[in-house]
Amino acid sequence: AGPYAFGL
């Protein structure tokens, strides 16, 4: 998972 997976 990457930052965008957490909405960041």
Swiss-Prot record:
Question: Does the record's keyword annotation contain Secreted?
Answer: yes
Q: Which residues carry this modification: Leucine amide?
A: L8
What are the alphabetically sorted keywords of the record? Amidation, Neuropeptide, Secreted
GO terms in the biological process aspect are: neuropeptide signaling pathway
- A single GO cellular-component term on record: extracellular region
Has the keyword rRNA processing been applied to this entry? no
Q: Where in the cell is it found?
A: Secreted
Job description of the protein: May act as a neurotransmitter or neuromodulator.
Family note: Belongs to the allatostatin family.
Q: List the protein's name.
A: Carcinustatin-8
| Taxonomic path | Eukaryota, Metazoa, Ecdysozoa, Arthropoda, Crustacea
